[in-house]
Regions:
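Short coil/turn connectors at secondary-structure junctions
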Residues: 14, 40-44, 82-88, 110-116, ...
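Thiamine diphosphate
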Residues: 1-126, 189-193
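Short, hinge-like loop/turn segments at secondary-structure boundaries
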Residues: 62-65, 108, 133-137, 223-226
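Conserved thiamine diphosphate
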Residues: 133-200
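Flexible, low-complexity linker and terminal segments
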Residues: 1-4, 13-14, 199-250
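Active-site-proximal loop->helix
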Residues: 102-107, 127-141
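Glycine-rich beta-alpha junction loops
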Residues: 50-52, 122-124, 180, 208-216
């Protein structure tokens, strides 16, 4: 019988700790599949965040380091400069990257560090119990915004891809999602392109994944996917925000 689908060698046999319906498992698989298909499993290092993905080093079958909160881009910068032949990437959530780690991600991008960041945007703080994140939508409820986010009080959500795309340093920025099979396929293509551009030494690459958090959104996994399509994506439009390989014909 022909094999239609099998587990990638890029993941260990450790049981994932993520909640049912969480998008991290899907993105982990995509990243691992791309690394395996590129032949980079023995040549990759991931910088793991503080947040729901804090144990990602147990799941990716590659070298990994756990970073201080928000400092994964700084850690990745040091690793890449010392080991430029390695494929180095950070894997971060919206609290780790867009709040406490804003300085690190902005300046790594501005410097054009030859690393890749996989950014999971689910609009909430997952690990700590559902507090409002920099990406929480207007009107969206959180434990620290029980009546819904009020832009007059809490400010507006940060569109990280758009913000970083204004900088000269990034080589490639794309926002994708995983709420449909077609979106998952596109997300995998974006991750592969980000890694390929890093291997070419062209600059900083960034893939934002609009994802889910059914537990802290207080909905079922199915409803969470619907919320992504109906509410998250309209505020965080999918697409390529910067690609110097197209702009410069590389």
């Amino acid at each position: 019988m022909a094999v239609v689908f099998e587990k990638t060698k890029g993941l260990t046999d450790a049981k994932l700790h993520y909640c049912p319906g969480c998008g991290h498992g899907i993105v982990h698989r995509l990243v691992a599949e791309v690394l395996e298909e590129m032949g980079e499993l023995g040549n990759s290092i991931t910088c793991v965040p503080v947040g729901c993905a804090v144990f990602a080093n147990n799941y990716f079958n590659i070298d990994a380091i756990q970073c201080a909160h928000g400092r994964a881009p700084a850690t990745a910068t040091g690793i890449k400069r010392v080991r430029p032949e390695q494929l180095v990437f950070t894997y971060q959530g919206d609290g780790d990257l867009a709040s406490i780690g804003t300085c690190e991600i902005v300046h790594a991008a501005a410097r054009g560090e030859k690393i890749t960041t996989i950014f999971i945007n689910n609009g909430i703080y997952g690990m700590t119990g559902g507090q409002m994140a920099p990406t929480t939508l207007p009107g969206m409820k959180a434990t620290t915004a029980q009546k819904g986010r009020d832009p007059k009080v809490n400010g507006n959500p940060i569109r990280v891809s758009e913000m970083l795309s204004t900088l000269t340093g990034p080589a490639y920025i794309e926002r994708v999602s995983i709420s449909t099979p077609a979106q998952i396929a596109q997300a995998k293509k974006a991750i592969r392109k980000a890694f390929e551009i890093q291997k070419q030494g062209l600059g900083f690459t960034f893939v934002e994944v609009v994802s889910t958090c059914p537990t802290n959104w207080g909905v079922t996994p199915v409803k969470a996917m619907e919320f992504v399509r109906e509410s998250m994506i309209p505020y965080y439009p999918l697409g390529v925000y910067k690609d110097i390989t197209v702009e410069e014909g590389k």
